[in-house]
Amino acid sequence: MTQITPQPGIMDIALYQGGAAHVDGVSNVTKLSSNENPLGPSPAAVEAMAEAAATMHRYPSSDHATLRAAIAETHGLDAERIICGAGSDEIIAFLCQCYAGPGDEVLYTEHGFAMYRISALAAGATPVEVKERERVTDVDALLAGCTAQTKLVFIANPNNPTGTMISEAEVARLADGIPEDAILVLDGAYAEYVEGFDAGAQLIAARHNVVMTRTFSKIYGLGGARVGWAYGPQEIIDVLNRVRGPFNVSTTALAGAEAAVRDTDYVQRCRLENAKWRGWLADQLAELGVPSDTSCTNFILARFASQSEAESCDDFLKQRGLIVRRVAGYNLPTALRITIGDETACRAVAAAVKDFKAGAAE
């Protein structure tokens, strides 16, 4: 029998592992493994989605015009240069599908989001991992890694899973230094957690080869709705729209996202609450001998003395019903990524790590 084989690169893709949500034998758990907003979505978004559910027998908008207009109004952008997707993951895949293929290279940082590599391989391109400097994007290393085959350069700023970010000046230096026929993709999934940060919008206005992606899954609390968007040069957005399915974002998701992006007061509340407990938890863990880099996101990367200690602490937390994220798959085997939950969750994490450390010292 003739064997049916997939395209080159597909079988090199490891199945994506999302954050765990259950612990065997533990009934009451707190999920802190997927960087979800503990406050949930805006009540306005929930109401809008409930109302939209009454029209689910109709196809959704094919051009997402009302959502694009709301995004443009909120962020001061040109709606014609916005594309919406089923999460920013889909747009990352569009970029690789349209601009990278066999013989092309896609650069990303050593601790970068897993979907960059996955999408590159799915397009038949060669993913190229570039070293970071102390868990921070290294612009010089990225520039040194560029070749004539480089077509896409992905960086998350702020980065996941490290929580670190580089300055706008460094991002501009990177944009200036990559090949002119390559696209710099700025993944701004966590941009809303940084007060006043535009995630590269001004840079895009001045360059022909920079795109930023954003999501409604983090500060907006709509991970279950699957909505993302991107902003870039008109020519690139036009290309991406040619491979986008006509009804790729559902009616309820469009309604919820529009209401969420307009509810700027709620976003500010989420930002401030996150900053408060992020700082508190980081300080508590540091006092226990568990340091973390200054985070610009809704999580902290807690660093332990060894992989064994990190894994033992993770097991201990699970028995307390606290689910965090091991990140050995991101080349960070001695660390745990901990989503910033509400006050109760943060206090529970601090208490559990304290008990773990005390037990380990006995």
UniProtKB/Swiss-Prot annotation:
Pfam families: Aminotran_1_2. Keywords: Amino-acid biosynthesis, Aminotransferase, Histidine biosynthesis, Pyridoxal phosphate, Transferase. Homodimer. NCBIfam families: hisC. The modification N6-(pyridoxal phosphate)lysine is found at residue 218. This is Histidinol-phosphate aminotransferase. One of its GO terms (molecular function) is pyridoxal phosphate binding. Its cofactor is pyridoxal 5'-phosphate. GO terms for biological process: L-histidine biosynthetic process. It catalyses: L-histidinol phosphate + 2-oxoglutarate = 3-(imidazol-4-yl)-2-oxopropyl phosphate + L-glutamate. The lineage of its organism: Bacteria, Pseudomonadati, Pseudomonadota, Alphaproteobacteria, Rhodobacterales. PANTHER family: HISTIDINOL-PHOSPHATE AMINOTRANSFERASE (PTHR43643:SF3), HISTIDINOL-PHOSPHATE AMINOTRANSFERASE 2 (PTHR43643). Disulfide bonds: none annotated. It comes from Ruegeria sp. (strain TM1040). It is an enzyme of class 2 (transferase). Belongs to the class-II pyridoxal-phosphate-dependent aminotransferase family. Histidinol-phosphate aminotransferase subfamily. Pathway: Amino-acid biosynthesis; L-histidine biosynthesis; L-histidine from 5-phospho-alpha-D-ribose 1-diphosphate: step 7/9. Its EC number is 2.6.1.9. It comes from the Bacteria.
